[in-house]
Each structure stands twice: as C-alpha cells, then as structure tokens.
Amino acid sequence: MGEERVFVSTLSKLFRINHGNKFEVIGYKSLGLLAGLYSVVQKEQRIMHDKRSEESSLEQSYQTLQPMDPDTARTVLVEVKKILDQLGVIFFLRQGTCLGAIRDKGFIPWDDDLDLGSVIGLHGFTEEQVDPVIVAFKELGYYTKLERCKEYLYIAMMKSNIRIDWTCYRIVDDNIIHFPGVPIPVHLITRLKEIEFAGETFLVPNPPEDYLAAKYGPNWMIPKSSGYEKDILAMITDLPIQQRQSAIGENSDSSTTRVRILDQHGEPVKNALVKVVRHGIFRTNEQGYALFRLPEENWYSLVINHSSHEEVLYQERLARGITYVYRPDPSTTSGRWLALSQE
C-alpha cells in the first residue's frame, strides 16, 4: 500500500497521494500562477454577473421608465461622448435629451434615458462602423443590444443603470424617421449646431427649435411628463381612410399578428379599434381579436379605442405571427410601455 504524503506543486496546488497512489487535490495556496488563474476566473465571473445584471436592467428600464439620476447620467453621457469622439463618430443629441438641453438647460426631471443619433451617409459615418463601435463599448463595460430595422439601426446600451439609445438613421426620401414614424427633414441634421451641455460641447440639430417642433409639435416648450404621446402621434400622417378600414379576415396564416382586446372585467371587446401607427386601423371580431400583418419585428405605437375608452400604447414590441393581449389599467390611460402580454 502506498504511503500518504502531502506536498505543494510548482503551481502552488496542494496535493495528496492517497493509499491508492493517486493524486488528489486537497487545496491550493494563493500564490504564483494558480493565484493569477483564480483571479482571472473571478474576473470572468464578475463580468458575466455584471452582464446579466445590465441586461436585466435594460429590460427593466423599459418596464419601469424610472427617471435617471442626473449626476450619473451626466457622467455616462460625457464618457459616451469621449468614446465616440475617439472613434471619429459624429453624433447629436436627439429627442428627450435634446429637448432637455434646449428647453430646460439640463436633463428633463422625468427622462429615463439618453438619446443620441447618427446618420448613415452623413458626416463620414457608414453602417460598417457600427459593429466596431459596439465592440469598443462592450470592452469598456457597457451592455449592448443591436437591432437592425428598415429605417435605422437601434443600439441600446446600459451602464450604471443608465440606458443609452443610440440610433443610426438611414435617409428615406430626404428624411430620417424618428420613432414612432415622425419624419425629420435631413437638412436639420446636415449642419449640426454646437451647444454647451453637461459641462461639454455637444451637437444638436440645426436649428434645434425647428427639430423639436417637428418631433414634438408646436407646443414643445410646454413641459409634459405624460400625455405628450398624443402630440407626437399628431405629427404622423395616417393612412387614407379607405386603407385604414382594411382587414385580413378570419382566415390568417403564421405571419399574422393578433391583438386581443379585453375590457376591465377580462371580457373580449367586439368592434374595438386597434390603430397600429403608420400601418392601419383594425376592428376586433366577436372574440376580441384584431388581425394585421407587420413588415418586421420592431417597436410600434398603438392606440386602443372602444366605447369611451382610449389608451395610447406608445412603445410595444411586436413580432409577426404572435398573439398579444391588451388589458386596461383603470388607474391610467397614457404612459404605459410594454403593456401587452403574449397570449
């Protein structure tokens, strides 16, 4: 029978030779190569944990729409600017971030994200630059998520519980299309204007007042924490009335999207109107289903109408071939995002 011995290997691992003359690891010392390897493993575990945490924070940010901490938002915005500047990417403040910078001279108190934009084909920016930029942000600790759509590339990033929405627009008929379908004349972006904001120099559309009126309507100077969605939808040209009333019918295929409308008692609503902004208005059948076809999986705005009830669902993620359910919230008729659930 073998003699039991204990020794330390050159890798600082503690071994024991048992009675069967087999090596058995019984511990290690935090020295040398093993300590370094253990440190690397710990670092990778922390990175994976942080990535899962930031991914969860991103999804949660869409659900809760919690206002940003202004000091943290300022720090993240300045860091993002530094990164994009070093990569040679021209970007501008857009939507709520631009609105706050121009109207409020700071972040809007209830704003929940940082809105940045670039235009493919302007200022030397190309679509091929997007992926390397995403890699750079990942290496610097940002969680990133890329979505490619017909009219833009949408890059959501998360760091320090701050969501950054960087949208890279394609030019469509001399416009760039802001969600949920607002056409912004590209000439407002061609020669960007410098402003002082958050202790740094940033670019905004030029003139910013015209841009904000195009996005938010003529009353953009009036602060609104809710209800602004209707002002934005009013800026979008709807489909002609004869197309708006078109329907697929009861027979549908795997590409048909359905939204079932329920009332406050959970009962299906017949003849409710479901407006999918830019894509038509559809009437529900006896089972409460509205049926329509979408061009792609994307974010969409919907307006639900029946009897005296109306609610704007400003930002919903819809895919082809999926059935969703709408349930009203008696406490509100505006401001909900991701209110639909899958059936």
Map each language-model feature to its residues.
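Short acidic, Pro/Gly- and aromatic-enriched capping/linker segments at domain boundaries
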Residues: 178-194, 280
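Conserved catalytic core of two-metal-ion nucleotidyltransferases
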Residues: 62-87, 133-180, 196-202, 226, ...
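Helical scaffold of the NTase/Pol beta-like nucleotidyltransferase catalytic core
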Residues: 9-94
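Short, acidic Ser/Thr/Gly-rich low-complexity loop/linker segments typical of extracellular
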Residues: 279-293
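Active-site nucleotide-donor binding segment shared across nucleotidyl transfer reactions
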Residues: 81-114, 120
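Conserved structural position at the C-terminal beta-strand
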Residues: 304-306
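Short Pro-Gly-centered beta-turn/loop motif in secreted/extracellular proteins
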Residues: 124-127, 291-302
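Short, ordered, surface-exposed loop/turn motifs in non-cytosolic proteins
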Residues: 256-257, 265-278
